[in-house]
Design a protein with these regions (language model features):
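Small/aliphatic-rich secondary-structure junction motif
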Residues: 1-61, 146, 156, 164-229
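Short beta->alpha connector loops
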Residues: 12-13, 107-111, 131-132, 175-176, ...
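Gly/Ser-rich helix-loop-strand patches that form or flank binding pockets
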Residues: 15, 19, 26, 111-161, ...
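Hydrophobic/aromatic beta-strand patches that form the interior of the parallel beta-sheet core
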Residues: 34-36, 104, 125, 152, ...
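Structural beta-alpha unit
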Residues: 40-43, 73, 81-124, 219-250, ...
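Electropositive phosphate-/nucleotide-binding environments in soluble metabolic enzymes
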Residues: 69, 73-76, 108, 179, ...
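Short, small-residue-enriched loops and turns at beta-alpha junctions
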Residues: 132, 202-206, 231-232, 258-259
Length: 284
């Protein structure tokens, strides 16, 4: 069951949408959303390789700190507004049976903040990377490769999702990553109204999709199996079949091949990351 959700934010304008997804889950599971803002150190904003006088350096440090204070204050107020909008209680700690949210502020690199807080989160919510603006890729990578926890990639939406984790699709290929994805999201699967296993039936040296269906049925999951013909564009096929069955969330193992290989040469995970229009829970 999802009890603690981490939401790393950085003032890039994507926080509201991701919070809408996290809030929807918090209300559904009575969970606690930790909104973690990574505040850059003023020293890191200094011009690199340029000699500046001590008075100018002091002035720049002061101005950087003031700007950071303004950003933090604005984001705190935005969180308060969003919490009220979604009916979530502001609380530094989780309250059993109540959807809550808290704000934390830390200095340093965002990857370190994600490591520290993500490793004890049931789910990490991040924005879908914006390739055109070069935003979000490092956040997704940090969450996937440095925490060992499930990561929900949230697509950009104009409003909160009407359904989330209600009809869940599983992209199954019998791999260790896929197995881990199922194991780490059992709480989601057991609470879903419907689960559809999507598979080509080509699980080489891995557990087959029929065995996964039986495994989930033994846990009381309402699950069905959909096999489709294998092609060289598995990522595209997964998304098409998600739309076909009406799934609102996809769960899959992430980057069975290396991230660099998939990014350069293409792969199922990278296609889904680039093209998905529904939330995707990824596990590496």
């Amino acid at each position: 069951m999802i009890r603690k959700i981490l939401l790393p934010v950085r003032g890039d304008g994507k926080g509201d949408n991701v919070f809408a997804h996290a809030a929807t889950l918090a209300v559904r599971y009575k969970g606690h959303v930790v909104v973690a803002h990574c505040r850059p150190r003023a020293e890191d904003l200094m011009p690199y390789g340029i000699a500046i006088s001590a008075p100018l350096r002091k002035l720049l440090l002061s101005q950087s700190a003031n700007v950071a204070d303004q950003v933090e204050d604005g984001m705190r107020k935005e969180l308060e507004s969003l919490a009220a909008r979604f009916g979530i209680t502001l609380s530094d700690k989780a309250i059993p049976g109540v959807a809550t949210t808290a704000w934390i502020e830390e200095q340093g690199r965002q990857v370190d903040v994600i490591k520290r807080h993500g490793r004890l989160a049931d789910l990490i919510c991040v924005a879908k990377p914006d390739v055109d603006r070069n935003l979000g890729t490092n956040t997704l990578k940090a969450a996937l490769f440095n925490t060992g926890r499930p990561v929900m990639m949230c697509p950009p939406l104009d409003s909160a999702p009407e359904r989330l984790c209600d009809h869940v699709a599983i992209g199954w290929n019998g791999s260790v990553e896929a197995s881990r994805a199922v194991a780490m999201t059992l709480g989601v699967l057991e609470e879903a109204s419907e689960v559809t296993v999507l598979s080509t039936g080509a699980e080489v040296n891995g557990a087959d999709s029929e065995s996964l269906k039986e495994y989930l049925q033994a846990r009381g999951v309402n699950v069905k199996l959909l096999r489709f013909k294998s092609s060289r564009k598995i990522g595209r096929d997964l998304l098409q079949h998600c739309a076909q069955v009406g799934a609102d969330t996809l769960i899959m193992g992430a980057y069975s091949n290396s991230h660099e290989t998939e990014t350069v040469f293409g792969g199922a995970t990278q296609y889904v990351v680039d093209h998905s229009g529904i939330p995707v829970i990824l596990v590496h």
